[in-house]
Amino acid sequence: MIEGDLIPAGHSLTEQARTHARTYNLRDHGFQVSDGPLFTAQEAALIKQHAQRVLNGVYETGVPPRTNTGGPDASVHPAYIEAQMPQDCDDVIASAIRHPGVARWAAEISGARRLKIWNAMVMQKRPSGGEKTKVGWHQDRRYNDNITRGPTMTVWIALADVPSALGPVRYVPRSHLWNRHFQTGFFDRDIDRQEREFDIPAGEIWQSVEAVLPAGWAVAHGPDVLHGSGENCGDAPRTSLLLSLGIDDFQVLPAHYFASRQNDPRAAPIIYPSGG
């Protein structure tokens, strides 16, 4: 078992992210780091501010998100909080999910002719949350198969610097090629047990790569790659924006909540091509 990729000590966060951007790609490894910021520093700071407002239960449009595990009393927030469909309640976030730089990059790395948002979330992993800030190894397909048909991808954007101490998203390169449907889940935090039990195909190796990111940078992944994250051992929250994208002629299953939002251009815009 190989734990971690070998980046020399002392490399800056930007150098680490650029190394990952050069080394790993969506097709061959199941994930890809942007080769630069998709949001400017000012954009990332503004979106982070509005993400925090939403997570604190402040909804500028008067419309709540679909779910919010935060709320007005931050003292009782759990260690990991998220709000789903925050574009309904905040204009800055509604604009951010349509950002042309994000759309162009996602289309470029995926080869998509068309990209449509079907879900979005703002998320925060709080410091000193211990085990409760871990996210177990999982494949998005385990969840997406109950919602969508056809190709999908996820884009995860850092709204502030995410060094290793904050528990960045981590990936198992090439695991999307193993032809395995693992039943491990997001909230299964016994990561050591998970790793002992995984059935790794002959000729493949286990490698865990942390997608450390400067503010405004992104990492994208497909539905079959194993990913998760460690605990936040740092001194700042890990705050991010997540976009779930449908590629080309994907469909949302008609019985699901998200199907009811697909004709709403604020909730589920076509972000590529622009004006689509």
Q: Which residues does each PLM region occupy?
A:
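Double-stranded beta-helix
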Residues: 5-6, 162-226, 250, 266, ...
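A short hydrophobic beta-strand segment most commonly corresponding to one strand
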Residues: 154-157, 236-251
